[in-house]
Amino acid sequence: MPPQFIGVTGLPRAGSTLLCQLLAQHPDIHCEGHSSPLCNTLLGIRRMVSDDQFFLSQLDNSFENSYAHLASAMHGYLRGWCQSAGKVAVVDKNRAWLHAIELLLHIEPEAKLIVCLRDLGQIYGSIEAQHQRTILVDFIDHLADYDRFGRADMLFAKDKAIGAPLISLHAVPDLPKAVQERLYFLRFEDLVTQPIACMSHLYAWLGLAPHQINPKQLSKGIPESDSHYHMKYPHRQASELKPPQHHDIPSRIQAQIESAYTWFYQNYYPQT
């Protein structure tokens, strides 16, 4: 029986590395923890075949058969990618999975996604703090020359590190209810303050056997490459879970974030 497919997606600096480390503690889960090219490859196949002249020439008279060939091939590619895991479930991490959720469910209807969330000001603060530690190296998209407000503004642009996944998150209410039911939203703040309860609830939602993690004794996986991101987005693992540093954000930047993304705070961080 093929393993259950679990995608990890969501916002940057929102605990996806920690989540994958915690998922890997479960004996029935195979989780390598690295960002995976699987989603990018499936999107690339769709783009490539949609422009292929041989494929297009078949659509007029044999659309159903040709489309079935493509669906079977993409389904087989995903299954083949995950088949060697040898566990009940396999985890694949890519920030683009939320953007591609309907494509994923078309070829793997039982797939589920875990969407990582964090206060947007703290996400910006985490990125800015790491930039100050590595200020002699530019970002991969050349944001070092901006002032702090300008850099924050650029990070939230629709094609940048924070803005791009936010667009996918903003589109979630437009998805059919059946699709939304395949999504689990996990706040970083809850994960680091209540890790045992969070993971127990998550394992149950995934339909896996109960398992209690030990936050003070965590096994570590193979480290992910940080140089590809110019050392701006580190993927550190630790053997013990500790509360993260709180980042002090300039009030002007925090106010701008909360004003521009009111929907985010209303949906995921409502006032109690």
What are these regions (language model features)?
Residues 8-10, 90-93, 115-117, 185-187:
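Short beta-strand segments
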Residues 15-29, 104-108, 128, 185-210:
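PAPS/PAP-binding and catalytic site of the sulfotransferase fold
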Residues 67-83, 123-205, 261:
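PAPS-dependent sulfotransferase catalytic domain
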Residues 1-6, 158, 170-177, 196-197, ...:
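PAPS-dependent sulfotransferases, especially Golgi type II membrane carbohydrate sulfotransferases
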Residues 70-103:
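Glycine-rich phosphate-binding loop used to anchor ATP phosphates in small-molecule kinases
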Residues 93-94, 104-130:
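Conserved phosphate-donor/acceptor-positioning beta-strand/loop module used by diverse small-molecule
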Residues 13-14, 25, 36-38, 96-98, ...:
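Short, solvent-exposed loop/turn segments at secondary-structure junctions
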Residues 1-75, 221-224, 235:
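PAPS-dependent sulfotransferase catalytic core
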